[in-house]
Swiss-Prot record:
Cofactor requirement: Zn(2+)
Subcellular location: Cytoplasm, Cytosol; Cell membrane; Secreted
Miscellaneous note of the record: ATP-binding induces a conformation change.
EC numbers for this chain: 3.4.24.56
UniProt: substrate binding residues: 336-342, 359-363
Result of altering residue 286 to G: Reduced enzyme activity
Recorded family membership: Belongs to the peptidase M16 family.
InterPro entries in UniProt: Metalloenz_LuxS/M16, Pept_M16_N, Pept_M16_Zn_BS, Peptidase_M16, Peptidase_M16_C, Peptidase_M16_M, PqqF-like_C_4
Comment, domains: The SlyX motif may be involved in the non-conventional secretion of the protein.
Effect of residue 184 to C: Increases catalytic rate towards INS and amyloid
Protein's name according to its UniProt entry: Insulin-degrading enzyme
GO CC annotations on file: basolateral plasma membrane; cell surface; cytoplasm; cytosol; cytosolic proteasome complex; external side of plasma membrane; extracellular exosome; extracellular space
Length: 1019
């Protein structure tokens, strides 16, 4: 695929570098809407410039205005009278590349500290508490060149939130006691990443360039860089934070985006009032004209040992910064071709040889002044032995592009696809939208900020050739990641401990690559037949319903249909669940269902890639009840793709070579689960404990050896022999078209796979284990990879119902911010601290998830201590404060989906849970508004208090790698810290030694009754 953003290579990294999503200039008039509103400066000295002509999509109903304040802050204002949440973001064009050389992670630490009190609002959790009380949330991230802060809040409270937010940039406190505690949060954040291959590889790439270049810095920081070493060197880190903020948090390096219901004039006045006081220190914008990879860092090979059993090949070329060429985007053009996955592509040829499974190619962001061009593949066992040949094929393909020369029709196709994507893009969620825009305001003229990432304008063959000229063997860096290098390395990266070996690539290999000839197997892509041409929005039908309607109900299928009446874009979402009792009957069948669908997707890839480029994608996966298929995107060519998928499902022939390769990759993924985070392990074990039927990773691994090609071939017709299909077709389609689509699916399966309906008795769902009153069970396991503990504590409350849902959700709303403030900010238990509802199989409860270096039984005691403080807190709460929580939860629940796929996912959740409560939000919020403080206290005392008569508790304790053992419960005297609230004395829990025995001894809950009477639902 074409490489889109820096984080595709490093999915865990918070590095939202400049996007390369396409490119960018005012589009043809037909595709653009211009702002009508104008606003004069009214001689306001705080405003230097106003941009009233922001180019936007004609489908975009929001109004925009750009500002440049006199102090240099760039601003984009968005007025959306329909928004439920308001949002704002501020991006400082400074990041970890500007850290002082002796205090790694200072910019990241500064980001953490700004949340913890300002002169105007000194209370440590004032900002987060205000947001929590008004249905809001906030976050921030630090990357090499950016620190980006953002929040959302109920639309009535934008001004109060923005006032608290603006103080971050005017007068933060950097309180000494907060600093001493928050350094632990940064350290815990780093510790979470230490055994993560994406972070390790990213740091190793930085470490193997020029050590004097800022790119080589360690950006996250940890306790050693932010406390221990500065203390040894006599450096006062609080003074350094003040100095850093004072030096770099200058208005000329800031960009702000604000979205609200207010008019553009009101938003203008608000931003001017709050942000024109930020001081302009005229800080020069950091630029990095020298590339971190110089002559001595090229023609090098790095052999790297990963944590997980993965095999990857990374081929990297240094290239100049292409940002200024955004109107022609030569990197996009080359990424489109090198990363193509259709017939005749580089991936197609490498896959046919059995060497690779996936390929990503394209430009990757560096910083102002430098970029990279990458070609990354994941290797098969065979591919690991043919790295030299794989890279030769890459250079053969690059040679093909040189020989053919830049093709204007390819550029035109990219331009058309991007123009369609821009015109019909989904409405964004406010928080993500403001954060993204604040980040890109630094790079484009105000008028082009919405179009720049999409619209291409100039075909520049000279620039394409310039970039192509950089993709030569003498410029290459190669990294191979494989467990096979264990014990054969001689170097260790400083911060993550990654083992690697560096070798110069021999001259004869470079020469061989330089002499790469043309390979007849390579072809440029053909014209894309999936580009939509019909964008007609169908008129609403007379019998259109506000919620999905059941328009077909037979032994073979249930079809739910909803014509879109909100978004009016030429898109649809088609969701299908194929129920089969064979899919999960035992671990062997579960493995076979998984492999069947992985092989099917693998064989469809060349065909479906063109559809994906044209905005039409599909998802296919095995589930505990059968198979799930969704097709999303432009409705014009949707039935063509769907028909192809169903035909392929019903007539699939397995390729033996691909079977072996994909089975081996599956075995590695099962083995790699051991390296997941401790808190993820805790969640996994709890699911195994609470669900009636769930196969473990070990059971699946054991059964995988029994999956042979003949066995899998025999399984597919068995799986398809009897099915029940439940579907939701939602979007720009008619009822008649929906019935036709469903008929096509059924007819195809009947014709090719002779599918018959399941019996109704075969459609029963799995149920949840019912814990006894006053029961407390503990299950312990160790994580062999990470040196942190993880815990999930689950208080099972009851079956889902309108009343039970609202008791639980309101309690979670009330404790959410205090939980984070107490357990993470004050007690510093760890970076990951979460509380909220857990729901599965119609049963629910309250859960706490924590990852920490502290032992699980200590975490357990702190959660119990916290719950006791919450009882008093709720009892002492004023009626006004209680009503604020009800209002905040109501706003969250009634927050409208922003796009078709989000609304569809909501309805689909009701269908697959078989609850069918499509109007859930309105009915539950109506009930919520009747609740009193006494109701919540009663709920707490009955279900959650230590001595509650209906308390049902399970705790999963995941021990850190180096912990030999740990008691399940312990006493922790408070005298070591007078600020800690008293933990209650806990009874001895029942330790679960064997999951099966545990489940065998307990009853199961019944299933929740459907909300719909099916006889009445039929139209």
């Amino acid at each position: 695929m074409r490489y889109r953003l820096a984080w595709l290579l490093h999915p865990a990294l918070p590095s939202t570098f400049r996007s390369v999503l396409g490119a960018r200039l005012p589009p043809p008039e037909r595709l653009c809407g211009f702002q009508k509103k104008t606003y004069s400066k009214m001689n306001n000295p705080a405003i230097k410039r106003i941009g009233n002509h922001i180019t936007k999509s004609p489908e975009d109903k929001r109004e925009y205005r750009g500002l440049e304040l006199a102090n240099g802050i760039k601003v984009l204002l968005i007025s959306d009278p329909t928004t439920d949440k308001s949002s704002a973001a501020l991006d400082v064009h400074i990041g970890s590349l500007s850290d002082p050389p002796n205090i790694a992670g200072l910019s990241h630490f500064c980001e953490h500290m700004l949340f913890l009190g300002t002169k105007k609002y000194p209370k440590e959790n004032e900002y987060s508490q205000f947001l929590s009380e008004h249905a809001g949330s906030s976050n921030a991230f630090t990357s090499g060149e950016h620190t980006n802060y953002y929040f959302d809040v109920s639309h009535e409270h934008l001004e109060g939130a923005l006032d608290r937010f603006a103080q971050f940039f005017l007068c933060p406190l950097f309180d000494e006691s907060c600093k001493d505690r928050e350094v632990n949060a940064v350290d815990s954040e780093h510790e979470k990443n230490v055994m993560n291959d994406a972070w390790r590889l990213f740091q190793l790439e930085k470490a193997t360039g020029n050590p004097k270049h800022p790119f080589s810095k360690f950006g996250t920081g940890n306790k050693y860089t932010l406390e221990t070493r500065p203390n040894q060197e006599g450096i006062d880190v609080r003074q350094e934070l003040l100095k850093f903020h004072s030096a770099y948090y200058s208005s000329n390096l800031m960009a702000v985006c604000v979205l609200g219901r207010e008019s553009l004039d009101d938003l203008t006045n608000l931003v001017v009032k709050l942000f024109s006081e930020v001081e302009n220190k005229n800080v020069p914008l950091p630029e990095f004209p020298e590339h971190p990879f110089q002559e001595e860092h090229l023609k090098q090979l790095y052999k790297i040992v990963p944590i997980k059993d993965i095999r990857n090949l990374y081929v990297t070329f240094p290239i100049p910064d292409l940002q200024k060429y955004y109107k022609s985007n030569p990197g996009h053009y080359l990424g489109h071709l090198i990363g193509h996955e259709g017939p005749g592509s580089l991936l197609s040829e490498l896959k046919s040889k059995g060497w690779v499974n996936t390929l990503v190619g394209g430009q990757k962001e560096g910083a102002r002044g430098f970029m990279f061009f990458i070609i990354n593949v994941d290797l098969t066992e065979e591919g690991l032995l043919h790295v030299e040949d794989i890279i030769l094929h890459m250079f053969q393909y690059i040679q093909k592009l040189r020989a053919e020369g830049p093709q204007e029709w390819v550029f035109q196709e990219c331009k058309d696809l991007n123009a369609v994507a821009f015109r019909f893009k989904d409405k964004e969620r406010p928080r993500g939208y403001t954060s993204k825009i604040a980040g890109i305001l630094h790079y484009y003229p105000l008028e082009e900020v919405l179009t720049a990432e999409y619209l291409l304008e100039e075909f520049r063959p000279d620039l394409i050739e310039m970039v192509l000229d950089k993709l030569r063997p003498e410029n290459v860096r190669v990294a191979i990641v494989s467990k096979s290098f264990e014990g054969k390395t001689d170097r260790t990266e400083e911060w993550y401990g990654t083992q690697y070996k560096q070798e110069a690539i021999p001259d004869e290999v470079i020469k061989k690559w330089q002499n790469a000839d043309l390979n007849g197997k390579f072809k440029l892509p053909t014209k894309n037949e999936f580009i939509p041409t019909n964008f007609e929005i169908l008129p609403l039908e007379k019998e259109a319903t506000p919620y999905p309607a059941l328009i077909k109900d037979t032994a073979m299928s249930k079809l739910w249909f909803k014509q879109d009446d909100k978004f009016f874009l030429p898109k649809a979402c088609l969701n299908f669940e194929f129920f089969s009792p064979f899919a999960y009957v035992d671990p062997l069948h579960c493995n076979m269902a998984y492999l069947y669908l992985e092989l099917l997707k693998d064989s469809l890839n060349e065909y479906a890639y063109a559809a994906e480029l044209a905005g039409l994608s599909y998802d296919l996966q095995n589930t505990i009840y059968g198979m799930y298929l969704s097709v999303k995107g432009y409705n014009d060519k949707q039935p063509i793709l769907l028909k192809k998928i169903i035909e392929k499902m019903a007539t699939f022939e397995i390729d033996e070579k691909r079977f072996e390769i994909i089975k081996e990759a599956y075995m590695r993924s099962l083995n790699n689960f051991r390296a997941e985070q401790p808190h993820q392990h805790a969640m996994y074990y709890l699911r195994l404990l609470m669900t009636e039927v769930a196969w473990t990773k070990d059971e699946l691994k054991e059964a995988l050896d029994d999956v042979t090609l003949p066995r899998l071939k025999a399984f597919i017709p068995q799986l398809l022999s009897r099915l029940h299909i439940e579907a939701l077709l939602h979007g720009n389609i008619t009822k008649q078209a929906a019935l036709g689509i469903m008929q096509m699916v059924e007819d195809t399966l009947i014709e090719h796979a002779h599918t018959k309906p399941l019996l109704p008795s075969q459609l029963v769902r799995y149920r949840e284990v019912q814990l006894p009153d006053r029961g407390w069970f503990v299950y312990q396991q160790r994580n062999e990879v990470h040196n942190n503990c993880g815990i999930e504590i689950y208080y099972q409350t009851d079956m889902q119902s309108t009343s039970e849902n609202m008791f639980l959700e309101l309690f979670c709303q009330i404790i959410s911010e205090p939980c984070f403030n107490t357990l993470r900010t004050k007690e510093q238990l760890g970076y990951i601290v979460f509380s909220g509802p857990r729901r599965a199989n119609g049963i629910q409860g309250l859960r706490f998830i924590i990852q920490s270096e502290k032992p699980p039984h200590y975490l357990e005691s702190r959660v119990e201590a916290f719950l006791i403080t919450m009882e008093k807190s709720i009892e002492d709460m004023t009626e006004e404060a209680f009503q604020k929580h009800i209002q905040a939860l109501a706003i969250r629940r009634l927050d409208k989906p922003k796009k078709l796929s989000a609304e569809c996912a909501k309805y689909w959740g009701e269908i697959i849970s078989q609850q069918y409560n499509f109007d859930r939000d309105n009915t539950e919020v109506a009930y919520l508004k009747t609740l009193t403080k006494e109701d919540i206290i009663k709920f707490y005392k009955e279900m959650l208090a230590v001595d509650a008569p209906r308390r049902h508790k399970v705790s999963v304790h995941v021990l850190a790698r180096e912990m030999d053992s740990c008691p399940v419960v312990g006493e922790f005297p408070c005298q070591n810290d007078i600020n800690l609230s008293q933990a209650p004395a806990l009874p001895q829990p029942e330790v679960i030694q064997n999951m099966t025995e545990f489940k065998r001894g307990l009853p199961l809950f019944p299933l929740v009754k459907p909300h719909i009477n099916f006889m009445a639902a039929k139209l």
